[in-house]
Regions:
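Hydrophobic alpha-helical transmembrane segments of multi-pass integral membrane proteins
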Residues: 1-172
């Protein structure tokens, strides 16, 4: 239902941010279907992470409409998101796909640090500043988790796998 609703929203409002949100919903649908079909947990975790990253990324992209961002940079975010979904879905089957997912998580974090409105609202006061600082700290954790995965692929069950998952799922 969630993926269908997200696709319906994207069809009604065909914008990059709604497309990225729909990709996140698709990642969740595929991950849950794979788990229900008997795939091992570690095979679906990359798709769950993609859901998480794409959903937050899509929401932040929507808020970035308030800032002037070059069309090419917006399209770059869309391309990163699309390939992130693909690499996450393939991570259980294709050697190197998890490394690519990590690299794309790092690229997502770099894009957000460069283009998110939080880079401007961090200069505000009170709650606005607190939220901006929290978001920027989360992007650092996303970059760290992505870098760990990109550097070594982090085999499920290893200490590096745990470190990458904690960095992304707790830090981000």
């Amino acid at each position: 239902i969630f993926a269908g609703a997200s696709l319906s929203i994207w069809r009604r409002q065909p914008a990059l941010q709604t497309g990225v949100l729909a990709l996140g919903a698709l990642a969740l649908l595929v991950a849950n279907a794979a788990l229900s079909a008997g795939r091992p947990l570690e095979a679906v975790v990359p798709s769950w992470i993609a859901f998480f990253v794409l959903t937050i990324g899509g929401e932040r992209l929507e808020l970035s409409r308030l800032m002037p961002i070059a069309r090419t940079m917006r399209l770059a975010f869309g391309a990163i998101s699309f390939v992130l979904l693909g690499s996450a879905l393939c991570a259980a089957f294709v050697p190197g796909a998890l490394r690519l997912s990590g690299l794309l998580m790092f690229a997502t974090a770099a894009w957000l640090v460069r283009h998110d409105i939080a880079t401007r609202t961090v200069r505000a006061a009170g709650l606005t500043r607190y939220i901006a600082l929290s978001l920027l700290a989360g992007y650092v954790w996303l970059a760290l988790g992505g870098a760990v995965l990109a550097a070594n692929g982090a085999a499920p069950g290893s200490g590096l796998w745990d470190a990458a998952l904690h960095a992304v799922l707790v830090g981000f």
